[in-house]
From Swiss-Prot:
This is Lysosomal-associated transmembrane protein 4B. Required for optimal lysosomal function. Blocks EGF-stimulated EGFR intraluminal sorting and degradation. Conversely by binding with the phosphatidylinositol 4,5-bisphosphate, regulates its PIP5K1C interaction, inhibits HGS ubiquitination and relieves LAPTM4B inhibition of EGFR degradation. Recruits SLC3A2 and SLC7A5 (the Leu transporter) to the lysosome, promoting entry of leucine and other essential amino acid (EAA) into the lysosome, stimulating activation of proton-transporting vacuolar (V)-ATPase protein pump (V-ATPase) and hence mTORC1 activation. Strongly expressed in fetal ovary, testis, adrenal gland, liver and uterus, and weakly expressed in the spleen. One of its GO terms (cellular component) is plasma membrane. Residues 205-221 are annotated as: Required for NEDD4 interaction. Homooligomer; upon reaching the lysosomes. Interacts with MCOLN1. Interacts with NEDD4; may play a role in the lysosomal sorting of LAPTM4B; enhances HGS association with NEDD4; mediates inhibition of EGFR degradation. Interacts with PIP5K1C; promotes SNX5 association with LAPTM4B; kinase activity of PIP5K1C is required; interaction is regulated by phosphatidylinositol 4,5-bisphosphate generated by PIP5K1C. Interacts with HGS; promotes HGS ubiquitination. Interacts with SNX5. Pfam families: Mtp (PF03821). Undergoes proteolytic cleavage following delivery to the lysosomes. The chain crosses the membrane at residues 26-46, 72-92, 100-120, 153-173. Keywords: Cell membrane, Cell projection, Endosome, Lysosome, Membrane, Transmembrane, Transmembrane helix, Transport, Ubl conjugation.
Length: 226
């Protein structure tokens, strides 16, 4: 007979490279934290020196302005929010506080849904890929080579690429979810479940049989004082 904790059942506690889900969630949170910090630094430098990051309409092949002040402020706010969410997930996994992981998990679900929507759009409207490629700047790398590819093959390649991304994102979602369940189980219950190797159980006898057996037993000898 061995003792099994409730939080170790029904799901895996290990993720990629055989590390624990807590370790994987911490590494994932730190990685996202670094990426968003780099993006925030780039946005702040672009806001401080807009001439250095200025792109004209002719360079972009369109009649619109690239990253105006309003869009820049929105992007900075999103980056700050993402840094906060990633920091909360990292802290929650390290300190075993399940509630701190929920915002990061919700972000993963939202990101997965957006990528799924892109895959569905490519599948339903395959001609939209060609239209999007035509709108790219003339000096975009490998634009002519991409345009020369068969449209059906191009759609299949893009769908395969998106499917790989979705599978990887789904795996990361499962790792974070298993970490949440593991921490939530440890914090909410300290009861150990005893698992036996056989199915035998101990049953109490019926009440009538117990009373009859107790009545047929000989009474104890009388007490004699010394």
């Amino acid at each position: 007979m061995k003792m099994v904790a409730p939080w170790t059942r029904f799901y895996s506690n290990s993720c990629c490279l055989c590390c624990h889900v807590r370790t994987g969630t911490i590494l994932l949170g730190v990685w996202y934290l670094i990426l968003n910090a780099v993006v925030l630094l780039i946005l702040l430098s672009a806001l401080a020196d807009p001439d250095h990051y200025h792109f004209s309409s002719s360079e972009l092949g369109g009649d619109f302005e690239f990253m105006d002040d309003a869009n820049m402020c929105i992007a900075i706010a999103i980056s700050v929010l993402m840094i906060l969410i990633c920091a909360m997930a990292t802290y929650g996994a390290y300190k075993q506080r399940a509630a701190w992981i929920i915002p990061f998990f919700c972000y993963q679900i939202f990101d997965f849904a957006l990528n799924t929507l892109v895959a569905v759009t490519v599948l339903v409207y395959p001609n939209s890929i060609q239209e999007y490629i035509r709108q790219l700047p003339p000096d975009f790398p490998y634009k002519d080579d991409i345009m020369s590819v068969n449209p059906t093959c191009l759609v299949l390649i893009i769908l395969l690429f998106i499917s790989i991304i979705l599978a990887f994102k789904g795996y990361l979602i499962s790792c974070v979810w298993n970490c949440y369940r593991y921490i939530n189980g440890r914090n909410s219950s300290d009861v150990l479940v005893y698992v036996t190797s056989n199915d035998s159980t101990v049953l109490l006898p019926p009440y009538d049989d117990a009373t009859v057996n107790s009545a047929t037993k000989e009474p104890p000898p009388p007490y004699v004082s010394a």
